[in-house]
């Protein structure tokens, strides 16, 4: 599955670095490189928004590596549990970014 998230932050430069650091860590744990793409940001009303595309192989590797943690995450649907896990993972690494799943296929 390919997941596309809309990310939002009020501290784009700081959170972008923290996001890249956290995603780099999770890629290393999953033995994946180039598992996601960040689109160009758009700023509105003090917030900066951008899309993050998570490639299928990265998503599947995360599900395999962290299956127990994902199962315990909030949500009734698998994609909700995955998103909650990812938000918790980022937050634990100091990244205060907000993620909203906008498409998965």
Question: What is each residue range found by the language model?
Answer:
Residues 1-4, 45-49, 92-94:
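A general secondary-structure signal for short beta-strands and their flanking turns/coil
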Residues 1-23, 103:
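Short, extreme N-terminal segment that most often corresponds to the first beta-strand
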Residues 97-105:
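Short acidic DE-rich linear segments
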């Amino acid at each position: 599955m390919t997941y596309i998230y809309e990310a939002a932050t009020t501290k784009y430069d700081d959170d972008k670095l923290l996001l890249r650091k956290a995603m780099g860590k999770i890629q290393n744990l999953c033995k994946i490189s180039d598992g996601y793409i960040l689109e160009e940001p758009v700023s509105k009303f003090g917030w900066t928004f951008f899309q993050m595309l998570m490639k299928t192989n990265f998503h599947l590797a995360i599900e395999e590596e962290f299956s127990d943690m994902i199962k315990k995450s909030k949500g009734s649907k698998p994609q909700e549990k995955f998103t909650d896990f990812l938000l918790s993972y980022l937050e634990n690494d100091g990244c205060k970014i907000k993620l909203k799943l906008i498409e998965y296929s």
